[in-house]
Amino acid sequence: MNTHPRVVYDCMIYLQAAAKPDRIHGTIRLVREGRVELCMSPEIVDELRDVLTRPEVRAKFPALTPERADVFLNDLLPQARLFQNVPAAFTLPRDVKDQPYVNLAIAARANYLVTWNERHLTYLMRQDTSEGQDFCRRFPEIKIVDPPTFVSEIQRSLLP
């Protein structure tokens, strides 16, 4: 049984890592080193495949060829735990497109949801919004943080 922290990454985390093959992102490195348990769902994998192969994304990130996207996914997916049939446990009125990430974090009993999306996701950690109060009350075990905070917290937890 894996006792490492469980994590859900939003789409932008994957996009940044796949688009810049010359750098190993700390978030992905933690997965590859087995320091965290990456949680994914078929819905998120499908979205990721779609985003990584969009012409406008490839135009912005020329290094992100279809072959590079395939290699990235083929390397990452065997290291992830796939959760099927994730129920809709929480409604995200600000952006329903982000609901699969929140609901996966809930279903996977993740410790972290890592995102750059302050407007639609990290606000759920704030007590000055009704959504934040509801989320924190119902799911206190999930921390929604940005990548630098996540990497720092995991690295600190690994210190002797």
Say what each PLM segment does.
Residues 1-40:
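Short, well-structured N-terminal submotif of metal-dependent ribonuclease cores
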Residues 12-13, 43, 119, 149:
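Alpha-helix/helix-capping structural signal
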Residues 32-35, 39-87:
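PIN-domain endoribonuclease scaffold, especially VapC-family toxins
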Residues 77-119, 123-126:
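Active-site neighborhoods of divalent-metal-dependent phosphate/nucleic-acid chemistry enzymes
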